[in-house]
């Protein structure tokens, strides 16, 4: 099973890397190109967290987990850029992103991988998980709302 997972994960990483390099090289002057390259990088990190070969180095694993946790926020930024006209990201959204990333990092470093359900676990894992779910759900909602105001006729 480990070999199959490594092969499929390697294929996914290679495709996402091509996507990231494409947007980083050919669309780096546009915000959407940089955001999509960052999103592809976050997805690469998410795939790498599941590969058994990457579980050897604890520091690399922490970096992969942090970048993977950033993916819902980056998806929300991409969706906001694409579907909301002339929208600026409010400061409280940036604060929310920094807060949930900080809580996840703190929880990962202090509680570890085998926590019991305590208040600290709820603050550092459960609440950030709901924030990430909220970012993802709102990104999908913005896409559906953007369909009605799209200029392309069906």
For each predicted feature, which ranges?
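N-terminal low-complexity or simple alpha-helical regulatory segments
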Residues: 1-123, 128-132, 139-153
